[in-house]
């Protein structure tokens, strides 16, 4: 693994595993549609070399209107399934607008899955607005700032979260 810091960007080069490909595939759709997003929580530590498994990848997306959400839904549903909503209408109105996440996995799989959500509060919005750009094996990812990520994981306080913060 090779990590380089450039101003506000970070470049990571490493051998990709199944989880990395999963995240890159999903985030490439968000990038393609210019949807502002940020990866938060456990995958951030995994990206930086923490050796552990993760069942879900948490991602905030900007609060888009239904028209733009439908575009995302159509793109995502080509390669992924939504685990907890049957259609874009239900996902948007019954979940996202009520600040409840929706989950996507590869077709016919459940784990790992993307937990996609709109920001719920000012801290979530700040996280989205102050994300860090990662150039990951020439792909673009956006993660929460490390300055926020570390205290957040310490605040959560589980053994796993404390190890993630290290």
Predicted features and spans:
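Compositionally biased terminal segments of proteins
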Residues: 1-166
């Amino acid at each position: 693994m090779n990590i380089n810091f450039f101003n506000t960007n970070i470049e990571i080069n490493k051998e990709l595993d199944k989880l990395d490909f999963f995240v890159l595939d999903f985030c490439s759709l968000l990038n393609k549609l210019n949807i502002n997003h940020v990866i938060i929580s456990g995958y951030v530590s995994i990206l930086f070399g923490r050796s552990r498994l993760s069942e879900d990848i948490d991602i905030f997306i900007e609060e888009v209107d239904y028209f733009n959400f439908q575009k995302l839904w159509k793109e995502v549903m080509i390669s992924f399934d939504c685990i907890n909503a049957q259609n874009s209408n239900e996902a948007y109105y019954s979940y996202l607008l009520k600040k409840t996440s929706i989950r996507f996995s590869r077709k016919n799989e459940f784990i790992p899955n993307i937990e996609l959500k709109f920001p719920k509060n000012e801290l979530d919005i700040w996280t989205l607005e102050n994300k860090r750009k990662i150039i990951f094996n020439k792909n673009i990812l956006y993660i929460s700032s490390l300055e926020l990520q570390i205290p957040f994981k310490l605040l959560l306080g589980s053994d796993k979260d404390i190890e993630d913060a290290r």
